[in-house]
Structures are given as structure tokens and as C-alpha cells.
């Protein structure tokens, strides 16, 4: 399989991951899919600590925290993996909750978000989902909450524009939503 450039990835990647694998010509079900997914996660575990935070990420979550706004992190990543990443970057004190999926296939994000919102002591609060994929927009729609999309993540600005949700290009632009 040829190397996938970041620009190509941001145009092609999608949820569910099974569909993305299929588009790449990889197995999307059965034991072959499980093996490829497990292999990816094994490689990811070797290198994840090399992944830096996005520019302004720490400053933004710190500033939002200083405003007294509760922040939760919702991810399609397996929850224990996401919590490890958050702890590694010393961000755990900024989040009321870290919610991920129960599997390595990035499946079940809407269900996990729904469960969190229905059982959280914050369930009657106003929410803003900040994401970087079309699926994040879909999650926000399913939950009936506002969505703001970041153009330097998994999906390109061109792809995100299909949603009609507002788009930011740098994470520090998120602060404008809280400081207005």
C-alpha cells in the first residue's frame, strides 16, 4: 500500500472506520479487519507519546477552565487510551469527564455521548461540541447541541464545510465563543 499523505488522509478518512478501510482496499469485516485494527493500535501505542498537542490547545483549555466553564472530552478512541493521552499531556485537571468508546474500532461515539449527557450532573447545561470530523457534526446533531469544527484535524476544511457548522482554523479562535 502506498504512503498516504496528510492531505489525502484528511480528504479520505471517515467514520465508520470500517468504511474508510474498505475505501482503501483493506478488509472491513471479520478476523482480517480485527487483525488490521489490532496491528494499527499496536503501532499507535509505540508512537502515541510522540504526538504533540495542536497549537494553542493547552492555552485554550486552561483559559476556558479559568472562566469556570466545565469541559469534557469526547473521543472515538478507546476510553482508556484517551485518558492515557490526556494524563501524558497533564490535561486531566481541565476536564470534568473524559469519554471514549469501549473498542478499538472507533464505534459507538453517539451512544457514549448520549449516555454521558443523560447521566451527567451537567445534563441540563448548554453544550458546544468542538470537533474535527463530519462525524462530530453528526454527533452534535444527534444530541441536539451546537457544533464548532476545527479545520486542522482529521478532516479538511472543504469536507467540514459540507456540514454548515461554523469552522475555526486555529484553536485559539474557540475563545471568541466564550469571551463574547
Regions found by a protein language model. Give the residues of each.
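Acidic, Mg2+-coordinating phosphoryl-transfer loop and its flanking beta/alpha structural elements
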Residues: 75, 128-167
Amino acid at each position: 500500500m502506498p504512503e498516504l499523505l496528510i492531505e489525502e488522509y484528511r480528504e479520505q478518512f471517515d467514520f465508520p472506520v470500517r468504511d474508510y478501510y474498505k475505501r482503501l482496499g483493506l478488509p472491513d469485516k471479520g478476523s482480517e479487519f480485527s487483525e488490521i485494527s489490532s496491528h494499527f493500535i499496536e503501532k499507535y501505542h509505540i508512537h502515541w507519546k510522540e504526538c504533540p498537542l495542536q497549537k494553542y490547545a493547552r492555552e485554550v483549555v486552561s483559559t476556558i477552565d479559568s472562566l469556570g466553564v466545565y469541559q469534557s472530552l469526547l473521543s472515538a478512541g478507546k476510553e482508556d487510551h484517551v485518558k492515557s493521552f490526556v494524563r501524558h499531556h497533564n490535561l486531566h485537571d481541565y476536564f470534568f469527564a473524559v469519554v471514549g468508546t469501549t473498542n478499538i474500532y472507533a464505534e459507538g461515539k453517539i451512544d457514549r455521548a448520549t449516555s454521558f449527557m443523560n447521566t451527567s450532573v451537567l445534563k441540563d447545561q448548554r453544550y458546544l461540541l468542538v470537533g474535527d470530523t463530519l462525524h462530530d457534526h453528526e454527533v452534535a446533531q444527534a444530541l441536539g447541541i451546537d457544533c464548532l469544527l476545527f479545520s486542522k484535524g482529521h478532516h479538511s476544511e472543504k469536507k467540514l464545510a459540507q456540514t454548515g457548522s461554523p469552522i475555526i482554523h486555529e484553536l485559539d479562535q474557540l475563545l471568541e465563543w466564550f469571551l463574547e
